[in-house]
A protein has these predicted regions:
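Alpha/beta-hydrolase active-site loop
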Residues: 148-174, 178, 195, 204-232, ...
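Conserved alpha/beta-hydrolase "acid-adjacent" motif
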Residues: 271, 292-298, 323
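Short beta-strand/loop motif that positions the catalytic acidic residue
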Residues: 279, 285-287
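Short alpha-helix in the alpha/beta-hydrolase fold that links the catalytic acid
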Residues: 275, 281, 295-305, 327
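Catalytic active-site module of serine/aspartate enzymes centered on a nucleophile-bearing elbow/loop
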Residues: 328-371
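Short substrate-entry loop that stabilizes the transition state in hydrolases
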Residues: 85-100, 105-142, 292-295
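Gly/Ala-rich beta-loop-alpha elbow adjacent to hydrolase catalytic centers
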Residues: 185-189, 193
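Domain-level recognition of soluble alpha/beta enzyme cores
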Residues: 22-103
């Protein structure tokens, strides 16, 4: 029974600083630098069926405002998909401060770190280093795999091991204020950062929900159609998959992380009353009231009910994909599901609200030092 529900429901689970600009009329204090790192963890990630064994990580960071930025688009398959923030590649980190706070970034199912460029760039422009892992087996840079799609809890290990790599990095490691590390995530990435905060998964609770009449869209995410070209679910779990399932309810708390910001967090039904007993750091939850992909009632509200001290922000009318980058005009009609918002919803304005909330949250929970 568990195997049947795991195949039918769990595979389908889940779609998806220092100085700040005081208001929308004030320019951000920094320009945005961009770089990439490839970290090789102790356990190679290709056991998930992924094409890469490494943790490919996008970086955004503050650079001096006199360094020119260039406009760019975020491409997929060699074609522009999203409008990116202006940035400069591989420029030196600003010398205005010796160290900067760090925010780890976790994307949603089948997405990429770059699909959250709107948030990462804004944080960097306001004095944060941001690192976004492209989760192996669950990103749009390579085929989705069953392991990457089903074994959600493994994503927290990606973040922690990328953090290990960052702190050891000869260029950026010494520029990170290790007392000021946070995490932000969208959709399945929202679930991921809650795990980093100490939340524990109740896999059976989620399976029961998706097998019940109450099952909703979280049990059948649209990204499921991309799962290895619609190939049948494997009849047998590999030893690695079985071992992973056995640790699904483990704690993935990373004590280096001091605060988490979860946008449209998914898998609310994979938590129970005891799941958050180990969460002792500040948590902020945000979603749009128009989200039908990760319904607010069974996800954000359920999680918030277990964490009465969490900050909750609901943005009227915003849908799930409103929290992805703004699409380039050429693809808006073709990719209507992720590119188009309801009448009256301005995606860029929603992003501005979300950025302001994230900056306010992290500025208070990762307070500035004299460095």
């Amino acid at each position: 029974m568990l195997r049947r529900y795991f195949a039918a429901a769990l595979v389908a689970a889940c779609c998806a600083t220092t100085a700040t600009a005081a208001d929308n009329d004030s320019p951000a204090p920094y320009h945005v630098g961009s770089a990439m790192r490839v970290f090789h963890p102790g356990v190679a990630r290709n056991w998930r069926g992924a094409q890469t064994e490494a943790l490919v990580t996008n970086l955004w960071y503050p650079v001096d405002a006199d360094i020119p930025e260039a406009a760019h688009t975020i491409d997929e398959g060699g074609r522009p998909l999203f409008q990116g923030h202006a940035l400069t590649n591989d420029a030196p980190v600003s010398a205005a401060h010796a160290k900067y706070p760090l925010v780890l970034l976790s994307h949603g199912t089948g997405g990429t770190a770059a699909s959250l460029d709107w948030l990462a760039s804004a944080l960097a422009a306001n004095g944060y280093i941001v690192a976004g892992v492209n989760h192996p087996g669950n990103n749009s840079l390579e085929p989705l795999t069953y392991e990457g799609f089903m074994l959600w809890w493994e994503r927290a290990t990606d973040q922690s091991e990328a953090l290990d790599g960052l702190l050891a990095d000869p260029v950026l490691g010494q520029r990170i204020d290790t007392a000021r590390i946070g995490a932000a995530g969208f959709s399945l990435g929202g679930y991921t950062v809650l795990e980093l905060a100490g939340a524990r998964t109740d896999l059976q609770a989620f399976l029961n929900f998706c097998a019940s009449p109450a099952a909703d869209a979280i049990c059948h995410p649209p990204e499921m159609q991309r799962l290895q070209g619609g190939a049948p679910v494997p009849a047998h779990f590999t030893p690695q998959m079985s071992a992973s399932m056995a640790r699904s309810s483990a704690s993935y708390r990373d004590t280096r992380i001091k605060a988490v910001f979860a946008i449209a967090p998914a898998l609310g039904e994979a938590f129970n009353e005891a799941s958050f007993s180990g969460v002792e750091i500040p948590v902020s939850l945000m979603a749009g009231t128009g989200d039908v992909t990760v319904p607010v009632e069974t996800n954000l509200h359920r999680v918030a009910g277990f964490m009465p001290n969490a900050k909750v922000t609901l943005l009227p009318g915003a849908t799930h994909y409103t929290f992805m980058d703004t699409c380039v005009p050429a693809v808006v009609e073709r990719l209507a599901r992720i590119c188009q918002d309801p009448p009256g919803v301005d995606r860029d304005a929603v992003h501005t609200q979300a950025v302001e909330a994230a900056l306010d949250f992290f500025n208070h929970t990762l307070p500035a030092t004299t460095q």
